[in-house]
């Protein structure tokens, strides 16, 4: 039993000290538990362990949260661990039920719910001590009252928060057992750090962090102090830091954040400063750099950015035209997905129509002077958005006809609209079953029907994909829709288990809550090549070991895109009263994150920043430039101007031919390999156009798109939004 702290400079997840402690635990207990920072790292480390004979069997690898959930199943009580969705539902419920006097300066807004949802997992078990401290403002005291009610609600419904779970596990976990080894796990919350420290009194706990020399290692050193306490003794791992293939890169790593005049890095061409003279040539500048590095023998690239989606949209097609494979893990919010928006439109329309149908029960249809009442719901535009989506099971022709008939009837009754939807002969079997599930308040069942329908379609498409060996846009969309609908089902199941019933009045609140949830979708540009480019946020670099890529590009190195993260003022102020434990500064984290990303390069690295007025260098870029002779970046940086337009600014062009202006129409034929990522080519037959736009819009016999009145109104509100929502670019 005891706590062992290690500083390691290799950056490997299986450093010498980690392997030694795993072997010792296996020898004594027959098993060991290794905690790593992310699910991506879990897969990487499992492959590495499989190649080491002594560690190939008996080592369980997981993230901390996964391990905590497993431990709760073994040693926890009958109470259930709370999800983030349910946490927000409970807080919103409590806030809505409080009077204005009880709320004080608090509001019932989404921001208040977010703030409370961040506080509860960490400080709920210490609420009494926080209140007794007597240093809270009126607003903070009101927040504590909400937390107190929340605590009582959890007890009533048999749920536990993270901090309560960890406190319970400290008591119930057996005195003896396999070692718990942490490798490169950064930024553990305060509740988790306390748990690790106290658990070391019952089990062997090893905490190993990557601590590079200089300011980049300050954050890790601070976290080791938080785990072990002030003045704790840390052992130093015997492994040596691996060297990059480029001496210039090694020198830069040794000097960044601690540059001194007269001790500059000697340039050799391994580090490049890209300075496009405008946003239109930014992507061309990056793609050309990748091409040049590929010609020099580089095979693997990472593009670190603060806006992965924007960079992916702009760069993936450019790389595809050059025959370079690109990958990206896309975080899709439910409200940004086609299926999520369509389902939200259905819920919105159903809630409105069901309320209207209740009012219509009191209308005497036979009376000549009967009043229609409020008709602001007519026409049911959100319903049409659902009908033309892939999750309705209704053909585009039928959806278009229904929309046309509803708009042509100014005395339309909501009751008749619902009757139409609930009859399979008039809509579709899927639509009718979905409506009937909603009538029973079973939103999970409604989503499950859609999942079954999409699963059947996906199975058929996958069979076609196996034959054609190509993944179509439609099949990718179905996979995304399946993940989104599964997320909605799991959220609905959580509410059901918590005893919360969904009514037509609460359906909208539920779907609003679901909209902000996200699913992860791995995407690629469809190119098969040994040259691979990963587009990722900087924080993802913690999932990689040093020198994992041949070349690394930092995109958008200005203060706006690559600045030091600002902390939540209200949250920080509350935490200051709730905890006396010192925190790791945001700037120390910034230095650590940049260095961790920088060291993933083995051969070359590029720093890209658009040259424009009133946009300043990011701190990290200024620190890098300080390692070089004065004005070195200006003299040697690669600038791409906009004054001479190049054809290769277009995604599908490859030759750097200079022209006076960009062509207004495409020339030549599109490469067949690229057709899957071209959403709306100019020259299409009726058949191919119908295939491309299936489930989106109607196509006439002449091969022209037909739009319903609802679609035209939506388009006129915001054309750009209309096109992007339908993935037409």
Give, region by region, the residue ranges found by the protein language model.
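PLD-like (HKD) phosphodiesterase/transphosphatidyltransferase domain
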Residues: 2-14, 18, 151-197, 274-292, ...
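Conserved helicase C-terminal RecA-like lobe
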Residues: 390, 394-402, 434, 446-480, ...
């Amino acid at each position: 039993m005891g706590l062992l702290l290690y500083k390691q400079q290799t950056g490997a997840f299986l450093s010498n000290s980690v392997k030694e402690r795993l072997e010792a635990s296996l020898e004594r207990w027959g098993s060991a538990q290794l905690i790593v920072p992310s699910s991506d790292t879990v897969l990487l480390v499992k492959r590495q362990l499989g190649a080491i004979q002594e560690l190939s069997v008996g080592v369980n690898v997981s993230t901390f949260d996964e391990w905590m959930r497993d431990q709760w199943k073994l040693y926890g009580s009958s109470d259930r661990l709370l999800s983030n969705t349910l946490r927000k539902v409970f807080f919103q419920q409590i806030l809505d039920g409080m009077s204005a006097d009880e709320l004080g300066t608090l509001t019932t807004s989404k921001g208040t719910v977010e703030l409370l949802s961040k506080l509860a997992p960490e400080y709920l078990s210490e609420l009494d001590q926080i209140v007794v401290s007597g240093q809270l403002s009126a607003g903070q005291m009101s927040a504590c009252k909400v937390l107190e009610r929340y605590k009582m609600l959890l007890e009533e419904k048999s749920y536990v928060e993270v901090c309560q779970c960890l406190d319970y596990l400290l008591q119930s976990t057996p005195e003896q057992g396999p070692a718990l080894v942490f490798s490169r796990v950064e930024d553990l919350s305060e509740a988790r750090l306390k748990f690790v420290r106290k658990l070391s009194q019952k089990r062997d706990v090893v905490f190993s962090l990557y601590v590079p020399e200089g300011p980049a290692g300050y954050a890790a050193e601070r976290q080791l102090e938080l785990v072990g306490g002030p003045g704790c003794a840390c052992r130093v791992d015997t492994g040596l830091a691996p060297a990059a293939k480029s001496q210039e890169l090694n020198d830069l790593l040794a000097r960044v954040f601690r540059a001194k005049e007269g001790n500059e890095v000697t340039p050799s061409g391994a580090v490049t400063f890209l300075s496009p003279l405008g946003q239109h040539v930014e992507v061309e500048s990056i793609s050309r750099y990748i091409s040049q590095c590929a010609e020099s023998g580089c095979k693997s690239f990472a593009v670190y950015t603060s806006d992965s989606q924007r960079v992916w949209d702009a760069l993936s097609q450019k790389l595809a035209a050059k025959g370079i494979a690109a990958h990206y893990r896309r975080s899709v919010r439910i409200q940004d997905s086609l299926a999520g928006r369509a389902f939200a439109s259905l819920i919105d329309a159903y809630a409105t129509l069901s309320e209207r149908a209740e009012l219509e029960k009191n209308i005497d249809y036979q009376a000549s002077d009967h009043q229609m009442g409020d008709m602001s719901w007519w026409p049911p535009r959100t319903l049409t958005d659902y009908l033309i989506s892939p999750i309705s099971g209704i053909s585009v022709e039928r959806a278009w006809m229904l929309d046309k008939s509803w708009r042509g009837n100014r005395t339309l009754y909501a009751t008749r609209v619902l009757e139409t939807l609930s009859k399979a002969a008039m809509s579709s079997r899927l639509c009718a079953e979905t409506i009937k599930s909603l009538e029973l308040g079973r939103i999970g069942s409604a989503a499950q029907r859609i999942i079954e329908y999409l699963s059947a379609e996906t199975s058929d498409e996958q069979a076609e994909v196996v034959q054609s060996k190509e993944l179509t846009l439609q099949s990718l969309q179905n996979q995304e829709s399946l993940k989104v609908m599964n997320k909605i089902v799991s959220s609905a199941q959580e509410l059901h288990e918590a005893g919360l019933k969904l009514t037509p009045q609460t359906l909208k609140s539920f779907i609003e809550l679901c909209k902000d949830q996200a699913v992860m979708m791995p995407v690629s540009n469809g190119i098969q090549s040994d040259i691979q480019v990963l587009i990722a946020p900087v924080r993802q670099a913690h999932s990689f070991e040093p020198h994992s890529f041949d070349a690394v590009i930092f995109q958008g190195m200005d203060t706006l895109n690559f600045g030091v993260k600002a902390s939540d003022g209200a949250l920080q102020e509350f935490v200051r009263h709730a905890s006396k434990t010192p925190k790791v500064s945001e700037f120390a984290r910034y230095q650590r994150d940049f260095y961790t990303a920088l060291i993933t390069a083995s051969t070359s690295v590029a720093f890209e920043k658009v040259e424009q007025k009133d946009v300043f260098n990011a701190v990290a870029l200024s620190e890098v430039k300080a390692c070089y002779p004065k004005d070195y970046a200006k003299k040697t940086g690669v600038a791409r101007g906009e004054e001479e337009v190049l054809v290769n600014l277009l995604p599908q062009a490859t030759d750097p031919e200079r022209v006076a202006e960009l062509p207004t129409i495409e020339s030549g034929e599109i490469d067949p390999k690229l057709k899957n990522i071209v959403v709306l080519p100019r020259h299409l037959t009726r058949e191919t156009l119908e295939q491309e736009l299936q489930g989106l819009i109607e196509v006439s016999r002449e091969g022209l798109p037909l739009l319903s009145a609802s679609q035209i109104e939506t388009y006129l509100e915001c054309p750009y939004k209309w096109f992007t929502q339908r993935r037409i670019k």
